[in-house]
Amino acid sequence: MVSYRLVLGVLVGIIFSFFTVYFFNMEYIEIINVQTDILKVIIIQLGANFKFDLIAFFTGTLNIVDFAPQLLASIFIGFLSGTISKGLKRGLIASSLVIIIDFLIWMLLSVISGEDLMALFQGAQLSGTIGGILSAILGAIIGGLLGGIISGPYEEVY
C-alpha cells in the first residue's frame, strides 16, 4: 500500500523544485524574463537546481556566492518533502525521489526542446554536470534526513 504522505511529499517537492532556486538566486530572473518559450523557462528553472558544482567547490575553483543558493534550495526541497512524508526512512526516500524525478524531467524536456545535452556530458562540462548532480542529491538527502527526524516517526496503521 502506498502512503499518501510519501506521494504528497514527493509531489510537493517536485512542485517546489521549479521555484526554489529561482527565489534563492535572483540572477536567473533576467534569463527567465528574456525567454519567450515556456519550455525553455521550465528547463532553466529545473536546471538551476543542478548548477552548483560540488567537485569544483572542494578543489577551490568556485566561490561561496554560487554555493549557497543551489545547495540551500536542494536542502529546502529535501526538508519539505521529508517533513511531509514523515519519518526518517520515508523522508530519505521522498527527497531522493524528488531529485531523481527532477533530473529526469530536466533531461526529457531538454531533449524535447532541442537542447545540446552532449555539451553537458563531455569535456570540461562533465565535471561540472556530475558535481551539480552530486550536490543536488547531497543537499536533498541532508534535507530529507533533517525533515524526517524533525517530523517524528511514521505511524503504521493496520
Task: Describe every region a protein language model picked out.
Residues 23-36, 107-117:
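Membrane-helix interface motif
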Residues 124-138:
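Individual transmembrane alpha-helices with interfacial aromatic-anchor signatures
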Residues 64-83, 87:
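Hydrophobic alpha-helical transmembrane segments
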